[in-house]
Amino acid sequence: MRSACLVFMAILALLLPAAAHAQDDGAFTAATEAVKAGQYQQITSILVARHGRVIYEHYFDAGGAAALRNTRSATKTVTGILVGAAVDRGLLRPESRVLGYFPDRRARLLYPDGRKAHITVEDFLTMSSILECDDENPVSRGNEERMYLVEDWVQFTLDLPIRGFPEWVPTPAQSPYGRAWSYCTAGPTTLGPLIQRAVKLPLPDFAQTVLFRPLGITDAKWAFTPLHDAMTGGGLQLTTRDLWKLGQLYLNGGRWDGRQVISAAWVRRSLSPHANARPDIDYGYLWWLQTFEIAGKPVKTWGMYGTGGNKVYVLPDQDAVIVVTTW
C-alpha cells in the first residue's frame, strides 16, 4: 500500500547512519500529525525500534496497544519461521517432498502427474513450485479466491495442474536463482497441515511452544480453514508489539532475551535470495528482500508484507525494525 510505504520511507530517513547520534523526535511528531490529519488515513499504528529498544510507538485507532492486528499475508512469514522451528528439531527438511506428508491424497489427485511427487517444502517457501498458481492473475487455476470457495484447501492445492511456460515466459532455468516465482497463497496454506503432520501437534500449539511463548506473545489469534486447520496463508492476528518481536527475532539472528529461539542457520537461509519476485525485489523463505533508496542511499530491508499495507520492515544495517499496520 502506497501510504504505508511513504510513511516507512519518511521514518527510515531518521535511521540513516548520519542521524545515528542525533535522533530527531520532531520527525516522529510530523509523521504522527500527518496520519492524524488524514494524509495516511488507513494507518492504525506505527512502531519504530532501534538497537532492540522501541523509540517511537503511536496508535491511531481506539484499539491502542492491546488491539490485535490482522497481519494478512505477513502470516506467511510466521509460517516460514515455524517451518524453521520444525527443521531445527529434526522433524522436517526444506527438501522434504510435500506429497510424502499426504499419502492419503495421492490416489485422488484431480491432475495426477509424476512431477508433483518432486514438489518440496522449499518450493512452497519460495513461491516457486511447478503448480499453476498465481494470485496476481485473476484467471489462474490456483488464484486464492478460487481456493476460498471450496472446503478442502490442501486438496485444492495438490489438485492444481502443472504450470506451463510458453516461449515468452521465462522458465525456471532462465530465471534468477533457477526458480520461476509467482505469488501463491495456496502453497503456504498447505504448509500448515504439513507442519502439523511433521510435528504431530496442532499448529497453534506448536507455534505457542516454539515461538510465541519464548517471545512473550500471549494473545495470538489464528484464522481457520473450513476443515479447522490453522490458516497459515493469512489472517493471524497479533499486536503491533508482537509483530515487532518477530522482526527483532530475525534481526537478532534468531535470539530473544538470551535464548536461541530459531537457529541462526535457518535465519540466514530464510533471508538469502532464492527467487526474484519483482525487478527490484528478491524473495527468501516467505520474506521479501527489498532495497529502498532513501536520501540517495541504498537501504536494505527484510520484509513481512501483508495486504493493505500491514508490514514489518527489518533494517539490518541500521539495527532497526519498523512496523506499520492498517485497517
List the model feature ranges, each with a label:
Residues 38-45, 61-105, 112-119, 173-183:
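Short active-site loop at a secondary-structure junction
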Residues 218-220, 268-321:
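Active-site Gly/Thr loop motif
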Residues 52, 69-95, 124, 191-195, ...:
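Active-site SXXK
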Residues 187-194, 234-255, 310-327:
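Active-site-proximal alpha-helical segments within enzyme catalytic domains
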Residues 85-104, 199-222, 257-264:
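Short, well-structured active-site flanking segments
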Residues 6-17:
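Bacterial N-terminal signal peptides
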Residues 100, 111-217, 240-244, 248-249:
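Active-site-adjacent helix/loop patches that line small-molecule binding or acyl-intermediate pockets
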Residues 34-63, 319-323:
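A short, well-structured edge-of-sheet supersecondary motif
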